[in-house]
């Protein structure tokens, strides 16, 4: 039986659509949809990753990190680090060691609307 579900496209609610859009563009994402039909919505993509950001009337969460930890796997953690630096995004780095034979690095940052962004070093 073929899989019924073939992709997931999360939508993040934000107060400042322009700042959030610019943040992801500076990291190398591109706009996959913007239009007059949905003026408070922008879809962004990079490779096989796609998600939306939407200005939501009444969005009042001052702690969106309590709602969502936004984690992306990246093929090149050094390039991800460089993009954050070039974009002027403050970040921290963490070395994870779940076991003796398994280590990887995480970069932690905040989006303009307060989401916790994690970039995880990984393999294909």
Task: Give the label of every model feature segment.
Residues 1, 34, 81, 85-124:
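Vicinal oxygen chelate
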Residues 1-19, 68-70, 120-124:
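N-terminal beta-strand motif that seeds the catalytic metal site of vicinal oxygen chelate
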Residues 2-4, 62-66, 101:
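A generic structural micro-feature
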Residues 4, 11-50:
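Core segments of cupin and vicinal oxygen chelate
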Residues 16-17, 74-78:
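Helix N-cap motif at beta-to-alpha junctions
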Residues 23, 78-83:
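Short amphipathic alpha-helices within nucleic acid-binding modules
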Residues 40-42, 68-70, 103-107:
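Short beta-strand micro-motifs in enzyme catalytic cores
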